[in-house]
Amino acid sequence: ALLLRRQGYEVIGVTLELWEKNDLSGVRDSCEKLNIPFLCREGHELFRQQVVDPFVKAYRSGLTPSPCCICNRRVKWILLQQVADELGVEYIATGHYVRIAEREGRFYIRKGIDPQKDQSYFLWGLPQALLRRALTPLGEYTKKQVKEWAARNGYEQMARRRESMGIC
């Protein structure tokens, strides 16, 4: 959000509650510190229908599902698009370590700069309509650079936050 603010974008913080209730105080504090609005969108039922139930069914059938890819395509980006459309917002930004490239009117997902943290696989199923609106500023940096930059800019708590490692 801070990177985008410095690039001149008007930013709104959006958190999706998909599985369990989380302590959102850190997110709220960050939005307050940045002086940007904060919204929380509930998506428990959609998440259960589109991710959890198919995951369990596939796993019981002996398959190895990829719930993060499904969640991004069928839940997270759908909800973010709904929020953006409701607010009349043109772009949807996330903290994924990927880059979006455009060539001849078609958008492509590219690996992020950091080979250790590239997340392009997780967004492979996004349609062109969403890729066209996507901003992924962290894809141009390594995770280490982002954490150092956050700490230097007064976001030490964010810089020290434990990484997400998979299923939610």
Say what each PLM segment does.
Residues 118, 122-168:
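Contiguous mid-protein beta-loop-alpha structural module that forms a pocket-lining wall or clamp
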